[in-house]
Amino acid sequence: MPSMNPIPSRNALTLALMLMASAAQAQSPSATEKPHPWQAAAPRLTAEAYFTNLKDGDRIETPYLLKFGLSGGWGLAPIAQPGRTKSGHHHLLINRDLPLNFKQALPFNDQYIHFGKGQMETVLTLAPGTYTLRMLLADQQHLPHFVYSKPATITVTKKNATDPRTLSVPGVSLQLEGPVVKNPFRVQFHASALNVAHLAQRLPDTGHFRLTVTPASGAPAVMAFVEGQTEVWLAPPAGNYTLQLELLDNVKTGQPLAPAATASVRVE
């Protein structure tokens, strides 16, 4: 893809309105699911779509597997069927600022990349150069939500001959702040080469996450994220825990779409 020049930044008034709307919309956890007592509210009031493995100033080589996250209790909903409130699908903006008109559908071109199947990642194949990237969530009609990322300006130093298709392998993973954490702490979910959706959409080839938190002694806590959520904040009692993340089929109820991912953590 050729190098492109970013357009001028949005005006301050529009940004202020976006932030206020995002804060009003963000809730944690989902209002339609009774949360487990160990679930906690996110420290930040605003919801955002974000990069989980890329930050402003990074220098990368392509092809590069870029991964997405979504906070504030929002969930992924493919465009095949309407999702509930606080749902949408990801968009990657390349050298484009946020739109000033959030009542106009996002265009389809090489600067607005749509992920309408509920994807959580893409492979960048950009040529060497400097780019500004950002994430933006939009609804079934591709109308933007006030859920987006800060811009990340990156430099592609080299484009390799690697086949991009080899970088994305079906599977799930979870990400923690570290092996030792303090409450509340975030658990981020990820699905590679698999699609995430609301259970109620009943779409083939999609799933929803289920997290099982097992203490060193006592009963495990099982949390189902049936509205497409891809992260959770937890505040369990101090101790040692094993976390297991699954992506369950939304049609063949209870059937995993990939082997579970596990991690151990100590809460102090």
Label for each model-derived stretch:
Residues 7-9, 29-35, 268:
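N-terminal intrinsically disordered, low-complexity tails enriched in polar/charged
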Residues 29-61, 156-182:
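Short, compositionally biased P/S/T/A/G/V-rich stretches that sit at domain boundaries
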Residues 12-22:
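Bacterial N-terminal signal peptides
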Residues 2-13:
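Bacterial N-terminal signal peptides that target proteins for export
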Residues 36-42, 65-71, 75-160, 184-192, ...:
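Long, low-complexity serine/threonine/glycine- and acidic-rich segments characteristic of extracellular
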